[in-house]
């Protein structure tokens, strides 16, 4: 991807009926390639302005998936755009840290849309 994403970025992606939000928790470079660690939010938005307004009060957003680990191919299969960057706090990273401590870590090669059950 041509954009230089970083931890704390809020990303917007389009689905048929509107827009969804993701947040970059971390980006790992491994021998097998890049692994994207994301959180996904429940809220869907009819337009970008509504999503932008929600990000301004992001503590009111609800998280549907606190941690998703995706291959680079899976991440790049859904077009996203950066909306804003906000520093992450320990609570944001809790599920990611638990994943790191887990012996049998799984990284998905499914797109964000498929993982979230969206089209």
Language-model-detected regions and their locations in the chain:
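Short, surface-exposed secondary-structure edge patches
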Residues: 1-4
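Short beta-strand-centered aromatic/proline hotspots
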Residues: 18-28
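Loop/turn positions that initiate beta-strands
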Residues: 6-10
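Basic/aromatic-rich interaction segments and small domains that mediate binding to polyanionic partners
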Residues: 27-52
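Intrinsically disordered, low-complexity, charged/polar segments
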Residues: 44-119
């Amino acid at each position: 991807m041509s954009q230089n994403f970083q931890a704390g970025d809020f990303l917007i992606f389009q689905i048929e009926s509107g827009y969804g939000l993701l947040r970059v928790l971390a980006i790992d470079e491994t021998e097998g390639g890049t692994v994207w660690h994301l959180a996904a939010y429940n809220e869907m938005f009819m337009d970008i302005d509504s999503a932008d307004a929600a990000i301004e009060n992001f503590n009111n957003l609800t998280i549907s998936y606190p941690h998703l680990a995706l291959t680079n191919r899976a991440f790049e299969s859904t077009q996203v755009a950066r909306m804003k960057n906000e520093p992450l706090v320990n609570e944001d990273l809790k599920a990611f840290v638990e994943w790191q401590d887990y012996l049998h870590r799984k990284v998905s090669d499914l797109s964000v849309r498929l993982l979230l059950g969206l089209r």
